Amino acid sequence: GAWLVTPEYVKAVGKELLDNIQSVVASHPMKGQDALVKKFVQRTGEPFMTQDPLCTYSHVWLIKEAIEQAKSADPKAIREALAKLDISAGPATAAFYPPRVKFDERGRRVGAAPLIVQWQGGEPYTVVPAAVATRPIVWH
């Protein structure tokens, strides 16, 4: 889970014990997001970006899109607009693989797929799927 790829986890366990540990997560920085991650690290002082701030970043953009489509600040109108969204590009999709946000009738994201993150040299990197990996997976 995502708790295995946090700065607090590396502080508690130590870099030397984490190398090659893998975790399945809903979101983690992917290939092509270097500028976003760099900006996050500079602004927060955190050593790397994790699932929580990345998802929050996209969620804010999703709400913005829904408000614009609803043309209203009414929560029910926003909820209805959010349920109808179908976005495949831009910051609203940054946290998700594949980069599409569309919800089914149960409110689940259509086509959602997890990522595998692996600790390498004291930092967690996306290693699977290869199309969005920031580092190749290491097998020992």
Where are these regions (language model features)?
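Extracytosolic ligand-binding ectodomains
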Residues: 1-140
